[in-house]
Amino acid sequence: MAAEVDSRPRGLPGGGASLGAAREHVQAVTRNYITHPRITYRTVCSVNGPLVVLDQVKFAQYAEIVNFTLPNGTQRSGQVLEVSGTKAIVQVFEGTSGIDAQKTTCEFTGDILRTPVSEDMLGRVFNGSGKPIDKGPVVMAEDFLDINGQPINPHDRIYPEEMIETGISPIDVMNSIARGQKIPIFSAAGLPHNEIAAQICRQAGLVKKSKAVLDYHDDNFAIVFAAMGVNMETARFFKSDFEQNGTMGNVCLFLNLANDPTIERIITPRLALTTAEFLAYQCEKHVLVILTDMSSYAEALREVSAAREEVPGRRGFPGYMYTDLATIYERAGRVEGRGGSITQIPILTMPNDDITHPIPDLTGFITEGQIYVDRQLHNRQIYPPINVLPSLSRLMKSAIGEGMTRKDHGDVSNQLYACYAIGKDVQAMKAVVGEEALTSEDLLYLEFLQKFEKKFINQGPYEKRSVFESLDLGWKLLRTFPKEMLKRIPQNIIDEFFSREGAPQDTEADTAL
């Protein structure tokens, strides 16, 4: 029997050409780039800021990685942001300077951006794209992970309940940090936020409870540090600080400096968090992630948005910045069945000291509180210049109290807040009416204000106070007032702790002053 031959002209609807085209589109979805050779393109049609537009592209996929080869042989990588018909818009991580529209070749890899991860990354220094810059060998990868992370089932998240003791009194007593929390440092240009972050890295540890079964050993602790758009001095400060304290073996550094490409800053925090997730959930380490400076990251986001000619939001930042920041900050926490945790401390510098700026404003919505670094305290030579009034820790309530720190912790914190706030009001009133018009109670609050800033907030960069020493110091300051004025503390707590005999560690706090 003779085979039937399609006599219809090729190219017409229903002909073999359209069937072939349909088959080709179906295969494009499941295309195997190992058995099929990749297509190399020389179809760069325009370059706009950090973006390259390619034409006559087949099988392009969203978020696919593209490798560029420049005329001089230099290799660069980019990511597909948008596909429309045969055109693809690619964001180049290393910048677009030197890309020749005529001679640059590019190749689509068919894969998303993955980073090699290994426990051997601790003690190493990488650039903003994850390549080693410490003259060491390439990382022998245990796995290649998607830099956008794996979504965590909210039902499997564990509520953070173990307090981290930082050794810094205003943080430990009034803004306690729980393991697995995300809490940013709101700072501004010229303030010592780097020194505070370094001090937290040096001194951080759990408040050791009795009969604990958790692993408190130093080997179980790791730090992942990601710098975006920082100067060489800041990078050197952190690196030398880690080396001097002997913790460099437990630190993994990702450095995107001010003279590195701006667009690279978009992937730097994601590389750092992917590494942190591997160390926390596969190696079961307790990881502290420090991201500085999130303002540089947001400006890189604005640059890409402007190049794509998207409708700008407040101050020119893209409307999706809230969502984008959330994809970074939400990668903190604890997961049921895993021994590790990720605690995030992002640092951001507020432009013009403005807390209503979109970057700190949106960050405050997503994160679980903030630590506010104040310029007026810094100008008065107080270190760390942490203003406790705008500072907040939303998870503090579950990390303190009897069995975790001490039963008077919450009440002492509330009373210190109340007295300091009233003291600030009295100070403002004194500037208007003069000291003679103040009552004796007002003068007590004024005295407390000065003592609080000089003795409680102020401490040395290498001075570590335990949470119990800080609480006893708080009681020492509260004894400025008669018992009747301490309205935020229950009577049974006052009876137990107010008298000097009731606080056995108070003599140690005296000598510390």
UniProtKB/Swiss-Prot annotation:
Known InterPro entries for this protein? ATP-synt_VA_C (IPR055190), ATPase_a/bsu_AS (IPR020003), ATPase_F1/V1/A1_a/bsu_N (IPR004100), ATPase_F1/V1/A1_a/bsu_nucl-bd (IPR000194), ATPase_V1-cplx_bsu (IPR005723), P-loop_NTPase (IPR027417), V-ATPase_su_B/beta (IPR022879)
A single GO CC term, please?
cytoplasm
Q: Which UniProt keywords apply?
A: ATP-binding, Cell membrane, Hydrogen ion transport, Ion transport, Membrane, Nucleotide-binding, Transport
Tissues where this protein is expressed: Kidney cortex and medulla.
Tell whether Membrane is among the UniProt keywords. Answer: yes
- The highest taxon in the source lineage is Eukaryota
Instruction: Give GO BP annotations, semicolon-separated.
Output: ATP metabolic process; inner ear morphogenesis; ossification; proton transmembrane transport; regulation of pH; vacuolar acidification; vacuolar proton-transporting V-type ATPase complex assembly
Against PROSITE patterns, the record matches this protein to: ATPASE_ALPHA_BETA
Q: How does it assemble?
A: V-ATPase is a heteromultimeric enzyme made up of two complexes: the ATP-hydrolytic V1 complex and the proton translocation V0 complex. The V1 complex consists of three catalytic AB heterodimers that form a heterohexamer, three peripheral stalks each consisting of EG heterodimers, one central rotor including subunits D and F, and the regulatory subunits C and H. The proton translocation complex V0 consists of the proton transport subunit a, a ring of proteolipid subunits c9c'', rotary subunit d, subunits e and f, and the accessory subunits ATP6AP1/Ac45 and ATP6AP2/PRR.
Q: Which PANTHER family does this chain map to?
A: V-TYPE PROTON ATPASE SUBUNIT B, V-TYPE PROTON ATPASE SUBUNIT B, KIDNEY ISOFORM
**Domain remark in the UniProt entry:** The PDZ-binding motif mediates interactions with NHERF1 and SCL4A7.
Question: Protein name, please?
Answer: V-type proton ATPase subunit B, kidney isoform
Species of origin: Bos taurus
Gene that specifies this protein: ATP6V1B1
